[in-house]
Swiss-Prot record:
The modification Phosphoserine is found at residues 64, 172, 306, 403, 447. The modification N6-(2-hydroxyisobutyryl)lysine is found at residue 168. This is Endoplasmin. The keyword Ubl conjugation does not apply. InterPro entries: HATPase_C_sf, Heat_shock_protein_90_CS, HSP90_C, Hsp90_fam, Hsp90_N, Ribosomal_Su5_D2-typ_SF. The modification Phosphothreonine is found at residue 786. The gene is HSP90B1.
Amino acid sequence: MRALWVLGLCCVLLTFGSVRADDEVDVDGTVEEDLGKSREGSRTDDEVVQREEEAIQLDGLNASQIRELREKSEKFAFQAEVNRMMKLIINSLYKNKEIFLRELISNASDALDKIRLISLTDENALAGNEELTVKIKCDKEKNLLHVTDTGVGMTREELVKNLGTIAKSGTSEFLNKMTEAQEDGQSTSELIGQFGVGFYSAFLVADKVIVTSKHNNDTQHIWESDSNEFSVIADPRGNTLGRGTTITLVLKEEASDYLELDTIKNLVKKYSQFINFPIYVWSSKTETVEEPAEEEEAAKEDKEESDDEAAVEEEEDEKKPKTKKVEKTVWDWELMNDIKPIWQRPSKEVEEDEYKAFYKSFSKESDDPMAYIHFTAEGEVTFKSILFVPTSAPRGLFDEYGSKKSDYIKLYVRRVFITDDFHDMMPKYLNFVKGVVDSDDLPLNVSRETLQQHKLLKVIRKKLVRKTLDMIKKIADEKYNDTFWKEFGTNIKLGVIEDHSNRTRLAKLLRFQSSHHPSDMTSLDQYVERMKEKQDKIYFMAGASRKEAESSPFVERLLKKGYEVIYLTEPVDEYCIQALPEFDGKRFQNVAKEGVKFDESEKSKESREAVEKEFEPLLNWMKDKALKDKIEKAVVSQRLTESPCALVASQYGWSGNMERIMKAQAYQTGKDISTNYYASQKKTFEINPRHPLIRDMLRRVKEDEDDKTVSDLAVVLFETATLRSGYLLPDTKAYGDRIERMLRLSLNIDPDAKVEEEPEEEPEETTEDTAEDTEQDEEEEMDAGTDEEEQETAEKSTAEKDEL
């Protein structure tokens, strides 16, 4: 019997051990398997729902409470039109997803503005929470992003009404107009700006959006949506906010970058740096702190010191709590928008140092601005602005001029950054101006990319240009000439060419070198003040350098008579002056073209006519025979005093400087009709009747018109005049040959004398002999080496035989 009991007990123990072993196998298998690794079909729907609920639980709510909330919450369906709108927003309107944070912060700022206004008349409005802030917190573990404000909050009815529909009325009309605008290729930004749809940009990055809100007149409620439907329920946690709203985003997998602190901080500083209310981000930093040393370390040190009794007695009185330095990660709210929008204050209240500090922070420059202007524009559109002129031109200022977008002007709407991606907020020639523009009149459009289409921007642009030119005009003359003009002079010249409406204002800012002073720059106003009594034109000469311009034959008589001549030494200068029809009632005269006339008396006129009659044979001979295909006509010059002749362009032709510039254009293909027309224009050949060469030519022509030497001399004079007048020769070889012929004649060398031929060189035999000797020596050396090797081999073989 006892044996049976023992046997039964053993069976029970074996059975129990087997069950425990099976359980251990199952548990081990469950632990090792990664349940979140994949979403296999083997899972039940309840398991999936449970895992999602655990993933998106809010602070203070566990998974079961979340599930209970969803079961009891009141469900609402978006209207069909709202669904269309949602798809439009998510898929097409927002090209840049990062603006979701800008929109949420902007809405938070509006809510804070509302509660602040209410508090002015209701002293209890801020009782729930006195601080007015926006706080942003990233939760990487739960994949959540929280944006909390202490604004006015929303009641249950407002949650349904404001967040359940995109527009309270007119949604159908809006969609119809948007469809029509898209079909016509027009901008939809003006239409979108009429509807508050910024909140829905959250669905660009979130699968679900949860809004927790507390209004002073209602209990705290939770609104939740996945963009298909939404639900609202009272918050079982009670009043956790005090007052305000928390928007929680359950981010999409591809939007996980928005949980990075650096990303969030950069977006806040980019878009919301100048919001009126403080914006905080929950962030970490490493700090070094001192902590009491551990007891073990202190005991160890005491044990080591106890070896010396005297030392212990001396140090007992000096013992203090021992500390050590430890690095700790500390989490706290970090303020993001510490730079204040000084443009919101009256300019009289802002100190110069504040402008300089703001410029350095705003533009990331280390130097102070050269000039600035702070103003408020009113009228068709009201906006505030601060504009700056930098001390030096930005690098690559003219790279891709006209096609490159300028990002120096930043547009804000109610202190919310909208964009700096403009083609035409400022004209191209003012692409160096930096500043901010803040308007309350512009709509916070959904599609900021098309904002530049807005009609009010044209008004803003016009006022910005006027204020910029006023700012530049006020720069002191010394500072303007020495600094501004060196850095931005080309921009002003381009402005004269491009900006017709402001051409007169820009002309007053022009500076050029002139014959009045060897180095100082002069303005057109100063030139006009120094003009001679009967002078009715502003004279200018264009050249590659000042030296070339002032040594040109065209300015000889002008300078001799005391007229001031402006020197144009930059490639854009002549274009600039051509774009100016006149200045202060005085027209411009290019001294390298026809039209230069001097006031002369009757006696001078009679003398000139007599000279023209005297040289008529030479002039006709040049025009009809010697230079028949090269010039339009030949005339006696009034502008030459030292040079024998010059080549003068017609009033609408190219000067030598302009022709050189046009031919240097990289895109010049020769197919442009107007270019070919100007390039093919014949010039007027002017001669100096007092020059000895010209007088001798007249004598020779009268003696023999068919003299080849005289014909060659005429052509050489023409080609020399072409070069001295700034033009290029089409055939430089022919010009060189003619110069050589003239030199031969001047040295009494026969023009047909040939160049002596070089003597033929005999072949050098010594080189070949030396090569043969060298080869023979090499062969003898090789033979000698071979004999020595054979002898060594024979001796070695004999020695081996002897050993054997």
